[in-house]
Amino acid sequence: MNRRTFTKRTLLASSAFALPKFSIAKPGETKKINVAVVGVGGMGGYAVNEAANENLVAMCDVDDSRAANAFKKYPDVARFKDFRVMLDKMGKDIDAVSISTPDHTHFAAAMAAMERGKHVFVQKPLAHNIWQVRTLRKAAEHYKVITQMGNQGHTFPGMRRIKEWIDAGVVGDVREVITWTNRPNPPWFVPPSSFPPVSGAVPNTLDWDLWQGPVKHQDYSSDYVPVKWRGWWNYGCGSLGDIGCHTFDAPFWALGLGSPISVEVDRKEPPGKGFIPMGSVVTYKFPARGKKPPVTLKWYEKGYEVPKPKRWQKDKDLPSGGGMYMEGEKETLYHSGMRPNSPMITPGKRFMEMKSKLVKIPKLPSVGNGPIQEWYRAIKGDGPMPGSNFDYSAPLTEMVLLGAIAQRTGKNIEWDSKEMKIKGMPELDSLIKEPTNNGWEYGENLW
């Protein structure tokens, strides 16, 4: 590929960097955003601190214990347990809503905010089922709001280097991608001592009904909260939902993977107890995209041996914590960890040989200070549309959720993206669009 062709492709890839249409201020105008945060413990604490650099006007959490640090740090900020009440009472005072709740309430919180014209940030995965992620994408356009999903790695310089190297033809055609994680592991994924788990008294700091929200209500158990919900299909999306939006991000973006046509699974134990497998291998098949060849992407969880790249240092193990590599016709592109902190060409000796060539490749625009700040800049009109806006993050999350369906059922599936159906398995329709409790329905008007 010559420089002119690469520059043209880079400009096309950079089209997402145009200023958004729905900002609240003119470029350069000094304005602080009125931000409400839903879910202020855990990752929500990070969201609260980011919001405090703007105008933190409201905090919402169903658990006073989990929220205690944020409530203590910002005692004068309005507090709520129900985000619907918060939006009804303070809607006129809120510009944007940052959501860091468990997976099963992402959709309802985001839709309630967008219906009122609020810009939204949602932690990964974007939602709990495929109908929800597609509806969120529709809603972002319908309500003309600026959106962002919290996969931090999408803002990293390493993410841009991967995209640049792929577009420049350094790696060559890629037909195989290998990804892996050391999860499921404690404290997030801990099988209960019995199924169903032992119930107990609801802590007086927790509104258990509100915590469950849109899904079928069950007796309280400490095997669900505060962090173990990730392992239960009613509430979480397993290791894939936890890490997939991070580790799939680079190949999904750089290779333009789009929607898979099939997903296969090998799991350690049979399905049926409502809890995730404690290890699996998921294989995605993607069709050719224009001149790009078909791609097989494999996801390895804890307990499965990950194959080493063809081009790798002898006697060196892959890092156990996680990583990703793409096998190209020319080179192997690799990064360790769940996110692309320091991508490289392997083996290391080859990377050193290529460095002088790689530094000459034109650079994509950088993103500073993480995904929430990127979202704030777009809202203010001081920066482009966020890179993980719902047009991008909804299809990425859909890929993750298809793998979760295969894990959950133990079935290999063929996916009809256009019809939003798993071929020949109508019994799985209820996992594509899950039942919702009365009073928690959103988005039906967008279909």
Which residues fall in each region the model found?
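Loop/turn elements at helix/coil->beta-strand transitions in domains of secreted/extracellular proteins
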Residues: 31-33, 54-57, 75-76, 92-96, ...
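Hydrophobic residues in well-ordered beta-strands that form the structural core
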Residues: 37, 99, 122, 128, ...
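Short, solvent-exposed turn/loop segments enriched in Gly/Ser/Thr/Pro and often Arg
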Residues: 63, 100-105, 126-128, 133, ...
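Beta-loop-alpha module in the N-terminal Rossmann-like domain of NAD(P)-dependent dehydrogenases
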Residues: 77-135
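Contiguous beta-strand/loop segments that form the cofactor/metal-binding neighborhood of enzyme cores
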Residues: 161, 173, 178-184, 188-391, ...
